[in-house]
Amino acid sequence: MRRLVTGGAGCIGSDLAAALAARGDEVVVLDNLSSGKIEHLAGLLDRPGFRLIEGDLSDTAMVDAAMEGVEMVYHLAANPDVKFTPGEPTDKDLTQNTLCTYNVLEAMRRRGISKLAFSSTSAVYGIAASLPIPEDAPFPRPISLYGATKLACEGLISSFQHLFGMQAWIFRFANVVGPKVRRKGRTVIGDFIHRLRQDPTRLMILGDGNQAKSYLLSEECVAAMLFAVERAQEPLNIFNLGCDDWLSVHAIADMVVEAMGLEGVRYEFTGGEGGWPGDVPRFLLDVGRINRLGWKARHNSREAVGLAIEASLAARPAEARTGTACRP
């Protein structure tokens, strides 16, 4: 069977593409490589049945062409930055998330493709009244542009599913970490490692350090998606994906400092409950639905973060262990 993975050169997308290819599927990856990397697909490029298309989902003709012969779409492409930076265009998330999702759905409708798996986010919930939060919680009120546009994507998917007889799986991810998620500023782990490589004596931490969230390894996120697509067969299937525990930012800082072999690091907190405007300070997903289906993460949040730290440091072990400044 032929599968299309949008954003398939990204951290999660490339793991998904590899998993699909490993089980014998033909895989088409469509990625504009703005944040994804060809090297993430190094083991797939020469594989029979694999094809990489460098293109953007805003190009409707290219999206339509990429879907030729495809039987199912895994739509992971999106703006990867949850944090809004003042001065940036406010329509970036709308364009890259919602409008591009519409382009995917419309191309599927024209091509007669009925199955879609979509990577959503815990950010759609906003600040929950109680934790952990289940999939059927009261109507979400996101507090970030990223979360708002992902929620709009879910609405489009639900509408297309109902109107045009599609089948869809929506996955609301916890914070996903892994060996490919290393860019500074993209994750708290990458940010801490970068800062400590620049100055091993102090570490600036956004917020008060008490922010706590659930963390999931990329490979386990992919495994959960594939498991649910195989086992859950409602017309519209929505799952939280994560662990049943959480980890604080302060604890992650301690883990990074210890892994880098540093001592006496001074923590400097910027203050406030959240790390930035639109950040949800404390969040825990109720993962009972995916657990009852038969899937559970093998690693808890601390273990997932620990493995991600090890992988990040292994990329440049000499600089990382000594705290020597280096280029990001």
Describe the residue ranges of each PLM region.
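Short, solvent-exposed loop/turn segments at secondary-structure boundaries
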Residues: 86-89, 145, 180-184, 279-281
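Short, surface-exposed alpha-helical segments at coil->helix boundaries
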Residues: 38-41, 154, 190, 250, ...
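CheY-like receiver
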Residues: 65-69, 107, 195, 224, ...
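Residues in well-ordered alpha-helical elements
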Residues: 61-64, 71, 83, 91, ...
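C-terminal substrate-binding subdomain of Rossmann-fold SDR/epimerase-dehydratase oxidoreductases
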Residues: 7, 16, 198-328
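N-terminal Rossmann-like NAD(P)+-binding domain of SDR-like oxidoreductases, especially those catalyzing
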Residues: 1-176, 326-327
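Hydrophobic aliphatic residues
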Residues: 45, 77, 108, 196-200, ...
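NAD(P)-dependent short-chain dehydrogenase/reductase
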Residues: 130-132, 155-214, 218-227, 244-246, ...
